Amino acid sequence: NPHYVDKDRDLDIACRRIAWGKFMNSGQTCVAPDYILCDPSIQSQVVEKLKKSLKEFYGEDAKKSRDYGRIINSRHFQRVMGLLEGQKVAYGGTGDATTRYIAPTILTDVDPESPVMQEEVFGPVLPIMCVRSLEEAIQFITQREKPLALYVFSPNDKVIKKMIAETSSGGVTANDVVVHISVHSLPYGGVGDSGMGSYHGRKSFETFSHRRSCLVRPLLNEETLKARYPRARPICPDT
């Protein structure tokens, strides 16, 4: 699930909302932001403001916070920790296999071909990759599998509309994260690799119900239907 941050956005608000959506349940939600795309000129600011928000939410040591979760099992713990190998860690990066704790982690200058950028993270690891324009961000997103969710932070409606028009995803939230799944009038689901079909509200009835086709015809006007019935006719003799 990509997250594009416009350099003209209010970064304090953007990073607080990103940190909330990414690190709730230790990143183990299907609509959590998987990575951030931003201009290189704001990467360091994004890191610092994310760190500020994380400390606001979970304190100086998230391991001691009653609100910070743990990884679901040991196998998944090892998988997520393996994604950190060879990466530049700007924050966090530590783990405790005994309690399956992984610290809120931010990665910078990430190689787009590295494993952490090739699969759903589903853990408290947030890579940041730099792009120099909205067009480059869109190109990066469209060259990959279609995500379940896509997020864009921008004060510019044209930026938001362009991102929506030129990408494909299960859902989009602009200037926030995750919350589109809480609006029951909006269908929730994926597209392509992120799954097909959707539910919520009326869409739930349509998705989980079978629309059975039924036709009842009258026993009238048989004379007009003669043309559809075959007639017994002799086979033409060979000539």
Curated annotation (Swiss-Prot):
Compartments where found: Cytoplasm
Any Pfam family matching the protein: Aldedh
EC number: 1.2.1.5
Major subcellular site: cytoplasm
SUPFAM superfamilies referenced in this protein's UniProt entry, alphabetically: ALDH-like (SSF53720)
Record flagged with keyword Lipid metabolism: yes
Keywords: Cytoplasm, Lipid metabolism, NADP, Oxidoreductase
A biological-process GO annotation: lipid metabolic process
Positions annotated as active site in the UniProt record: C30
One annotated GO molecular function: aldehyde dehydrogenase (NAD+) activity
Signal peptide: none
PROSITE patterns according to UniProt: ALDEHYDE_DEHYDR_CYS
Catalysis performed (reactions): an aldehyde + NAD(+) + H2O = a carboxylate + NADH + 2 H(+); octanal + NAD(+) + H2O = octanoate + NADH + 2 H(+)
Top-rank lineage group of the source organism: Eukaryota
InterPro entries registered for this protein in UniProt: Ald_DH/histidinol_DH (IPR016161), Ald_DH_C (IPR016163), Ald_DH_CS_CYS (IPR016160), Ald_DH_N (IPR016162), Aldehyde_DH_dom (IPR015590), Aldehyde_DH_NAD(P) (IPR012394)
Disulfide bonds: none
A GO-annotated cellular component: cytoplasm
Function: ALDHs play a major role in the detoxification of alcohol-derived acetaldehyde. They are involved in the metabolism of corticosteroids, biogenic amines, neurotransmitters, and lipid peroxidation. Oxidizes medium and long chain aldehydes into non-toxic fatty acids. Preferentially oxidizes aromatic aldehyde substrates. Comprises about 50 percent of corneal epithelial soluble proteins. May play a role in preventing corneal damage caused by ultraviolet light.
Assembly with partners or alone: Homodimer.
Family per similarity comment: Belongs to the aldehyde dehydrogenase family.
Protein known as: Aldehyde dehydrogenase, dimeric NADP-preferring
Organism name: Bos taurus (Bovine)
